[in-house]
Amino acid sequence: MAVFDKCAQAYQDKFMDVGMYEDTFDVFCAHISNHDAAILDIACGPGNITKYLLSKRPDFKILGIDLAVNMVALAQANNPTAEFRVMDGRAIVALEKKYEGIMCGFCLPYLSKEEAVQLISDAGKILSEGGVLYLSTMEDEYSKSGVKTASNGDELFVHYHEAGYLIEALHRQGFKIIDTQRKEYRGGDGWAVTDLEIIAIKHNNPDDLNTPA
């Protein structure tokens, strides 16, 4: 996570505005009716998503986690009413708590296929019945994953994911898909990028899970 610690401030300057995704975050919020709901923000970065969620639902009790110390420091400064800690998103079952919402906005591109599927499984274990899971990733053939070079020369391995195996993993864990969206834009070097957003509800009735992608 040295790359993210190094570029934390630059990342905040570039990505603090989450306007492109606000409509999907609104769907997430709309499906959490309980007041003071416990929300987990995985790979929270500088707290950009947490900040938006709290602007819509100041009652949310949000815990944000990130592996980068500098990201966590920025997130806490940006969201003094939320809680943040340095933690690996692949270890969320260690929290030993139930959440009514889990936000995974910018994590999956840094997880392998196997890790992404495991994260969905882990999320199912710590979500309450009726809890909401938000997933977002860059969508493409998984085989196209590889090392990407940032404008400052830093290199990072980026994973593309496919909707098919993510949705299959969600259904296996008792999730019902309630919203699927795709957003297209141009990446930093001009290449076309498709962001996939999936919102699902933890639903333990297997007869009620046959929702098309």
Task: Please report, for each region that a protein language model flagged, where it lies by residue.
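Short, glycine-/aromatic-enriched active-site segment of Class I SAM-dependent methyltransferases
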Residues: M138-F157
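Class I SAM-dependent methyltransferase SAM/SAH-binding core
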Residues: L40-I42, P46-A91
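A conserved beta-strand element that flanks and buttresses the S-adenosyl-L-methionine
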Residues: M103-C104
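Conserved class I S-adenosyl-L-methionine
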Residues: M1-S33, E141
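A short glycine-rich, Lys/Arg-flanked "PGG" loop and its adjoining helix->strand segment in the class I
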Residues: V117-E129
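Conserved beta-strand signature within the Rossmann-like core of class I S-adenosyl-L-methionine
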Residues: G130-T137
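Core SAM-dependent methyltransferase catalytic element
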Residues: R186-A213
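Short alpha-helix
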Residues: V158-Q173
